[in-house]
Amino acid sequence: MKKVLALVVAAAMGLSSAAFAAETATPAKTATPAKTTQNTQHHKKQHKKTVEQKAQAAKKHQKKDGKKAPAKSTSKTTSQPAA
């Protein structure tokens, strides 16, 4: 009889400790989240290029002969898989 009582007490102690561990593991629901302050970033204005700089860049990107490159064909041969 004493063994049965000891087992019941041990089981009750184990269940209560498991319940206590589960209760402390969950976050408190009543706590309010901390307010975050939002920092705004001010971007510097970009200076526009002068007309001379634009002309130099345009000269740099022109093709020498004025010919366009031949268009590449993108058709691929596709084989149908065997059924």
From Swiss-Prot:
GO CC term (a single one): periplasmic space
Regions of compositional bias (Basic residues) in chain numbering: 57-70
Subcellular location: Periplasm
Signal peptide (residue range): 1-21
UniProt key word Hydrolase: no
Region annotation Disordered: where it falls in the sequence: 22-83
Cysteines engaged in disulfide bonds, as pairs: none
Chain intervals with Low complexity compositional bias: 22-40, 71-83
Predominant subcellular localization, coarse grouping: periplasm
Keywords of this entry: Periplasm, Signal
Pfam families assigned to the protein according to its UniProt record, in alphabetical order: Asr
Signal in keyword set: yes
Propeptide span(s): 22-56
Alphabetized HAMAP family for the sequence: Asr (MF_00546)
Family assignment from sequence similarity: Belongs to the Asr family.
Function: Required for growth and/or survival at acidic conditions.
Protein name per Swiss-Prot or TrEMBL: Acid shock protein
